[in-house]
């Protein structure tokens, strides 16, 4: 029965994909909301489509796993996998799991998702003893084999960097937490009572690599602050393998192709409905569930809390929507 439901979903969602029809953002909103009922589209107030393009990476970084990448295999009885799972409630004392960050106008999503999921995993593996935020900027600026910084990077290489060089601590620009907080300010949006200045016309450049703590109020040396991984790997493409990995070790990093309509996601279970391809994006999968019979992944984005469902989104599960199930990576921390 489960496979019949998935087959039906594939057929339905395939019928929805009619790219390049609407010519304006307003037309995309109307088209999405009139053609399907799984999710609601709404033009965001605080982020433009041009800003979103700067926050994405080239689609080459979303490619499925290559043969040289180790793929972890879980021996699991699929009948034992729960119908719903949410890392936020499974590990409520891990401060990173509930944290939504802001990558600003830089295609640093690959570094953010790695730092976020690694932060979660250190807390989980240590039973809360290592409860911190790891620095997206450390891997963004200092991993020379990861890719091109603000132009994008390979998620698996960020996890390999965690094994080889480690991540120091560091939170958001606003919080100035840890050794190396993010140095690129939010821009063009109002968050709470703070309105940030307009974004740079061409987006941000990749910050320079600095092998020291940039937070002057942090009293731990850069090398002593490093947190290391023991392994880095890809996760099998089957839904049950991704679920088993999250249950065993915590949230994973995944990459997918972004289309114009995703920019307008407001609520519901996203399925690509229309619009041009914009680029690739990396995110953190926290769990899964169903909404009126539609299976979904629960995902944390890095576009601040004003976007989507308070910074989160749900995307249809079991159909490899936009490639999201074929580019999942993770690793085990040293604790």
From Swiss-Prot:
Family: Belongs to the peptidase C1 family.
Annotated compartments: Secreted
Keywords on record: Disulfide bond, Glycoprotein, Hydrolase, Protease, Secreted, Signal, Thiol protease, Zymogen
Induction details: Induced by ultraviolet and ionizing radiation through a cep-1-dependent mechanism.
Gene disruption: observed consequences: RNAi-mediated knockdown results in greatly reduced radiation-induced bystander effect (RIBE) activity in the culture medium of irradiated animals.
Signal peptide from the UniProt entry: 1-15
Major localisation: secreted
Function: Thiol protease which shows activity against the fluorogenic substrate z-Arg-Arg-AMC.
GO cellular component, one term: lysosome
Lineage of source species: Eukaryota, Metazoa, Ecdysozoa, Nematoda, Chromadorea
Additional free-text comment from the UniProt record: Mediates the radiation-induced bystander effect (RIBE), a process in which factors released by irradiated cells or tissues exert effects on unexposed cells or tissues. Following localized ultraviolet irradiation of the head, mediates RIBE in multiple unexposed regions including the posterior region. Also leads to RIBE including inhibition of cell death and increased embryonic lethality of progeny in unirradiated animals exposed to the culture medium of irradiated animals. Likely to exert RIBE by acting through the insulin-like receptor daf-2.
InterPro entries in alphabetical order: Papain-like_cys_pep_sf, Pept_asp_AS, Pept_cys_AS, Pept_his_AS, Peptidase_C1A, Peptidase_C1A_C
Effect recorded for residue 281 to A: Loss of protease and RIBE activity
EC numbers on record: 3.4.22.-
Name of protein: Cathepsin B-like cysteine proteinase 4
Propeptide: 16-80
Glycosylation sites: 193
Biological process terms in GO annotation: cellular response to gamma radiation; cellular response to UV; proteolysis involved in protein catabolic process
Keyword Secreted recorded: yes
One term of GO molecular function: cysteine-type endopeptidase activity
Entry annotation: catalytic residues: 109, 281, 301
CDD domains: Peptidase_C1A_CathepsinB (cd02620)
Disulfide bond residue pairs: 94-123, 106-150, 142-209, 143-146, 179-213, 187-199
